[in-house]
Regions:
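An N-terminal alpha-helical hairpin/helix-loop-helix interaction module that forms a charged
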Residues: 1-152, 168-250
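A short, conserved structural fragment
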Residues: 322-332
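Short helix-capping/hinge SLiMs at alpha-helix to coil transitions
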Residues: 168-169, 272-276, 289-293, 330
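Short, amphipathic alpha-helical interaction segments positioned at domain boundaries
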Residues: 340-350
Length: 350
């Protein structure tokens, strides 16, 4: 793990705050940066002419789907223009990125309210103040502006990503990788999952977001927890999701012979026995009971990470059953049969 980016990101966030009431100069600097490095300014407004900008969108300029070379070029340009003293990062472990097609935190000028960008700046300032002092006043101001921004167009889970960028030891990133990772019992304790699971069904308001943050920080204090910070959690989530995605792509090419086909029927039956839905752990336990699996069969490890073979195969089976419409994936940490899953006539290969 290499978190060299944190010093740069936090210093830049602090300097960016000084432009809260001088956005014209900030926009001028952005144009200057891109001109100096020889890259076109991305589309940030309807007519390609930036009239206003928020700080999280500025961070998004170098935290989206671009090459590492261009990313480092932009960071060098920013360092020069804003006199950043921290080292230019070349490693970005644990940094979530935006979709290139959704890289602004505001709607274009004809679709946004006059106060939308102002509100984001207020949240940005409140977040930095909160990170420096978790006082009652700072916490309340953060809650106030987070909840205001929460209701604005173009704001979804990206708001938690933006907060994490600017103060990664204070705010938790709730992008899709982290949400997926945190509700897996292989990665976090049951007590934690039970406490946060329902809070991840939709973008949380400030009170629930801070509750998730606080519960997570409390979990980090446990001697058994291998993560001690939000950046470490994000890093491990990225590593694991990349591993799973790679395996899924590999298996996709030979799906007809996939070893996890054997779990289609047992998984559907297990969820039926559970009343139509259950946690991954409940589903696996029901499969063990129904199939009379031995401890030896469900304890086999494989791969460099010593991943549990049974749990992985059931997870892959679930992914394919989601793709084919038999299991619903809308609720994190809960596997639920669709109407098709409830009524399908089961064979070994469905």
């Amino acid at each position: 793990m290499n978190f060299e980016w944190i010093d740069y990101y936090t210093e830049f966030a602090t300097k960016l705050l000084t432009f809260k009431d001088n956005r014209e100069e900030l926009i001028h600097k952005i144009y200057s940066i891109y001109d100096n490095i020889g890259i076109s300014v991305p589309k940030l407004e309807k007519d390609d002419e930036i009239t206003d900008i928020d700080p999280f969108t500025v961070f998004g300029l170098f935290n989206k789907g671009i090459t590492n070379n261009n990313r480092i070029l932009i960071l060098n340009g920013i360092a020069s223009e804003f006199q950043i003293s921290a080292n230019i990062p070349v490693n970005f472990d644990g940094v979530p990125v935006l979709n290139n097609l959704k890289a602004t935190f505001y709607s274009f000028i004809d679709e946004r309210n006059d106060s939308d960008i102002d509100n984001i700046w207020e949240l940005f300032e409140a977040a930095i103040n909160f990170s420096e002092s978790n006082s009652k006043e700072n916490r309340q101001r953060f809650i106030e502006y987070y909840n205001i921004v929460h209701e604005q167009r173009c704001i979804k889970w990206n708001i938690t990503i933006g907060l994490y960028w600017i103060r990664p030891y204070t705010f938790i990133n709730l992008d899709s990788r982290n949400r997926w990772y945190m509700v897996d019992t292989n990665n976090m304790p049951d007590e934690f999952i039970n406490a946060i699971n329902k809070k991840l069904n939709k973008v949380p308001y400030a009170e629930e977001y801070l509750e998730i943050r606080d519960i997570c920080q409390k979990t980090f204090e446990s001697a058994e927890c291998k993560y001690k910070s939000f950046p470490e959690l994000s890093y491990y989530a990225w590593i694991e999701s990349e591993r799973v995605n790679k395996e899924l792509k590999s298996e996709d090419k030979r799906a007809s012979k996939a070893y996890f086909l054997r779990w289609f029927k047992p998984l559907i039956q297990a969820l039926r026995d559970l009343g139509g839905s259950g946690t991954p752990a409940q589903a696996r336990q029901k499969i063990v009971e129904n199939e009379k699996l031995t401890d030896e069969e469900i304890s086999i490890k494989r791969g460099k990470n010593n991943a549990n073979k049974f749990e992985n195969e059931v997870a892959f089976a679930r992914s394919y059953l989601v793709k084919t419409g038999y299991i619903d994936k809308s609720v994190y940490g809960i596997w639920t049969l669709t109407d098709a899953g409830k009524n399908v006539e089961m064979t070994d290969e469905l």
